[in-house]
């Protein structure tokens, strides 16, 4: 039923079972069965005609935790036939993580996902800075992605705070916020999504009830 609704609402970017290489997810630690489950899901969606209208995003965390070979993100990859886009959660490691300074920023954190597939488009499916990094440097690298990593076609800033992950809000750092406002003026970035997109999806949601 969910697959049929997704087909009717399309196009949407669908990111199921993300961050599978992180120990905080219930499906972490078993790459073999993860791949089997993903392929089964994709095959069902294909049979229902969903894959022709929607984008399936396979989206690990930028850093595998634990960082063992058995838990490497590549082990969870179901194959190019079963994935449309690559996604990645892109955050600085926590204060307790023993990563050097240059491993805490977008351009470096992107390197792992690039190795999984040679030509799939990439999106930062969620990301943002934290107290463990230089906020202005993070913002600068965020906007450099379009020039230095041309496969990156979309970015999503997770603008929130909580006790576990700290304050990731842009407005928490006035200097970083002003830099963001300046850099986002580049016409490359979408300003507004047309109202028709919202109204069309809302209509379809109402019709599916």
Predicted regions and their residues:
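An active-site-proximal structural segment forming one wall of the substrate-binding cleft
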Residues: 1-13, 33-49, 72-78, 146-147
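Active-site groove signature of glycoside hydrolases
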Residues: 2-31, 53-62, 86
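Extracytoplasmic/secreted cell-surface and envelope-processing proteins
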Residues: 23-27, 65-68, 95-98, 131-135, ...
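Alpha-helical scaffolding within the catalytic cores
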Residues: 1-2, 62-78, 100-114, 136-145
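Substrate-binding cleft of secreted/luminal carbohydrate-active enzymes
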Residues: 12-13, 120-209
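Cell-envelope and extracellular/periplasmic
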Residues: 18-19, 27, 61, 79-81, ...
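Glycoside hydrolase catalytic-domain groove-lining segments
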Residues: 85-133
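Aromatic-lined carbohydrate-recognition surfaces of secreted/lumenal glycan-active proteins
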Residues: 38, 42-71, 119-132, 154-160
């Amino acid at each position: 039923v969910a697959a049929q609704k997704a087909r009717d609402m399309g196009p949407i970017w669908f990111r199921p079972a993300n961050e599978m290489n992180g120990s905080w997810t219930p499906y972490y630690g078993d790459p073999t069965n993860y791949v089997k489950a993903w392929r089964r899901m994709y095959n069902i969606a294909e049979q229902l005609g969903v894959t022709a209208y929607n984008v399936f995003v396979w989206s690990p965390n930028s850093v595998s935790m634990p960082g063992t070979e058995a838990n490497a993100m590549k082990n969870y990859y179901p194959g190019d036939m079963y994935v449309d886009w690559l996604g990645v959660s892109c955050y600085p490691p926590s204060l307790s993580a023993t990563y050097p300074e240059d491993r805490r920023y977008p351009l470096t954190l992107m390197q792992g996902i690039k190795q999984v597939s040679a030509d799939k488009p990439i999106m930062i499916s969620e990301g943002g800075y934290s107290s463990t990094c230089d906020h202005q440097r993070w913002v600068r690298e965020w906007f450099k992605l379009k020039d230095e990593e041309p496969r990156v076609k979309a970015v999503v800033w997770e603008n929130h705070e909580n006790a576990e992950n700290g304050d990731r809000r842009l407005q928490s750092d006035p200097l970083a916020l002003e830099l963001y406002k300046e850099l986002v003026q580049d016409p490359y970035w979408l300003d507004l999504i047309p109202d028709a997109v919202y109204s069309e999806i809302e209509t379809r949601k109402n019709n599916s009830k």
